[in-house]
């Protein structure tokens, strides 16, 4: 990539704040959206025990996801709060017999120049041709981006920096007053822009087969636009809830192994996800699950995050997160609870606690026992694991390290998972990397880009079906929508104005 012109000696962060403050964002009317497309599906094929995966061997077979009829969006999937849904970062899985071989992966690119042109064929941003819109959100939109030189598609998030700064942090909200990053002391207070840079610097260096990869970050200081390029996972979420045709127990076991390894990697990097659920788990071409959507994630110091704010999706929230005690609670334990709810969804197609009213749902989560339906019939080992993951007491709830050793996960020791040392390496960022996490470079003065892309809409994973996206304040991933007749070089239709969903408190 070519180098941009020299930037003046002024502090680039202060310069960006000044530039962003000068940007006036007009509110446009919400564009009409079409109905949700039908989703085809059949029962997932029965899984035989996977053979060892070695370089050059066949990838794990991918079951077909279940069909879903049009439905009203429920508390089982609607997130609480309006935060940036940024599926980001990196990836490992399986036992010794189920681990995807690590392949060489290029580092995240830092662009020195953002060049945008509106040609007869399409809107082009550097080497990317922007095509159909595949997602919307509170901070911008997601568009399908085609890199002609690589003959490859990506998901490009176009964000409003002004809205990011207003929210005091990317990709999450600031910690509430009185919250502590560690048990021993208060969290380090960062300026909004410093938090943006620090978290992008970390996300750019995450590298794991069970976390979606951030490819490139582009910045245009003269405009209110920040561009994040991610791997495009066309298969979308592993499941949508509720679901009439859940997974066979063996398939659920393999997917849980992926999730646990990805979660262990994030916790090793001192990140708690806070919104683990089936729609935030994307299916890769290799058949493995990748964690996405870090919209309400938190970084922490010390051994665990001590949280006091509510975030995530109502039906996946842990009892301690919705308690009125006012006490802080463990971030890692929250992720385990949500993973337990997800595992329940995998085998039963619904959440263990369901209600149309949020207060009643909270009461059920805090007070009612987990009930296992008679059908489908599952093993006692699986029930035991679910009950231990859905322990209402976070102090006695099973941890990630013990889940990896559970008999159901390992088939009684026949298929052990790799140790933390084998698949996790701590990501550390220097002050220089934080400073350079996003290049502040001037764009071409003749550029026109789509401010209507940035107007007011809840924005999360780029795989969210259009109809469901209307009903939520923070999107979770759904099937990838690619408009018919839009080829690699086609002209993107005029971008509709988008409205920002109000945050649910």
Curated annotation (Swiss-Prot):
<feature type="binding site">
    <location>
        <begin position="134"/>
        <end position="142"/>
    </location>
    <ligand>
        <name>ATP</name>
    </ligand>
</feature>
<dbReference type="GO" id="GO:0106310">
    <property type="term" value="F:protein serine kinase activity"/>
</dbReference>
<feature type="region of interest" description="Disordered">
    <location>
        <begin position="460"/>
        <end position="505"/>
    </location>
</feature>
<keyword id="KW-0808">Transferase</keyword>
<dbReference type="GO" id="GO:0005524">
    <property type="term" value="F:ATP binding"/>
</dbReference>
<feature type="modified residue" description="Phosphoserine">
    <location>
        <position position="492"/>
    </location>
</feature>
<comment type="function">
    <text>Calcium/calmodulin-dependent protein kinase that belongs to a proposed calcium-triggered signaling cascade involved in a number of cellular processes. Phosphorylates CAMK1, CAMK1D, CAMK1G and CAMK4. Involved in regulating cell apoptosis. Promotes cell survival by phosphorylating AKT1/PKB that inhibits pro-apoptotic BAD/Bcl2-antagonist of cell death.</text>
</comment>
<dbReference type="GO" id="GO:0005654">
    <property type="term" value="C:nucleoplasm"/>
</dbReference>
<keyword id="KW-0112">Calmodulin-binding</keyword>
<keyword id="KW-0488">Methylation</keyword>
<feature type="region of interest" description="Disordered">
    <location>
        <begin position="28"/>
        <end position="66"/>
    </location>
</feature>
<feature type="binding site">
    <location>
        <position position="157"/>
    </location>
    <ligand>
        <name>ATP</name>
    </ligand>
</feature>
<comment type="subunit">
    <text>Interacts with CAMK4 and calmodulin.</text>
</comment>
<keyword id="KW-0539">Nucleus</keyword>
<dbReference type="InterPro" id="IPR008271">
    <property type="entry name" value="Ser/Thr_kinase_AS"/>
</dbReference>
<feature type="domain" description="Protein kinase">
    <location>
        <begin position="128"/>
        <end position="409"/>
    </location>
</feature>
<feature type="modified residue" description="Phosphothreonine">
    <location>
        <position position="108"/>
    </location>
</feature>
<keyword id="KW-0597">Phosphoprotein</keyword>
<feature type="modified residue" description="Phosphoserine">
    <location>
        <position position="100"/>
    </location>
</feature>
<feature type="active site" description="Proton acceptor">
    <location>
        <position position="275"/>
    </location>
</feature>
<feature type="modified residue" description="Phosphoserine">
    <location>
        <position position="67"/>
    </location>
</feature>
<dbReference type="InterPro" id="IPR017441">
    <property type="entry name" value="Protein_kinase_ATP_BS"/>
</dbReference>
<dbReference type="InterPro" id="IPR000719">
    <property type="entry name" value="Prot_kinase_dom"/>
</dbReference>
<feature type="modified residue" description="Phosphoserine">
    <location>
        <position position="74"/>
    </location>
</feature>
<feature type="region of interest" description="Calmodulin-binding">
    <location>
        <begin position="438"/>
        <end position="463"/>
    </location>
</feature>
<dbReference type="InterPro" id="IPR011009">
    <property type="entry name" value="Kinase-like_dom_sf"/>
</dbReference>
<keyword id="KW-0418">Kinase</keyword>
<keyword id="KW-0067">ATP-binding</keyword>
<comment type="similarity">
    <text>Belongs to the protein kinase superfamily. Ser/Thr protein kinase family.</text>
</comment>
<keyword id="KW-0723">Serine/threonine-protein kinase</keyword>
<protein>
    <recommendedName>
        <fullName>Calcium/calmodulin-dependent protein kinase kinase 1</fullName>
        <ecNumber>2.7.11.17</ecNumber>
    </recommendedName>
</protein>
<feature type="modified residue" description="Asymmetric dimethylarginine">
    <location>
        <position position="78"/>
    </location>
</feature>
<dbReference type="Pfam" id="PF00069">
    <property type="entry name" value="Pkinase"/>
</dbReference>
<feature type="modified residue" description="Phosphoserine">
    <location>
        <position position="475"/>
    </location>
</feature>
<feature type="region of interest" description="Autoinhibitory domain">
    <location>
        <begin position="435"/>
        <end position="440"/>
    </location>
</feature>
<feature type="region of interest" description="RP domain">
    <location>
        <begin position="167"/>
        <end position="189"/>
    </location>
</feature>
<feature type="modified residue" description="Phosphoserine">
    <location>
        <position position="458"/>
    </location>
</feature>
<dbReference type="GO" id="GO:0004683">
    <property type="term" value="F:calcium/calmodulin-dependent protein kinase activity"/>
</dbReference>
<keyword id="KW-0547">Nucleotide-binding</keyword>
<dbReference type="GO" id="GO:0005516">
    <property type="term" value="F:calmodulin binding"/>
</dbReference>
<feature type="region of interest" description="Disordered">
    <location>
        <begin position="84"/>
        <end position="105"/>
    </location>
</feature>
<dbReference type="GO" id="GO:0005829">
    <property type="term" value="C:cytosol"/>
</dbReference>
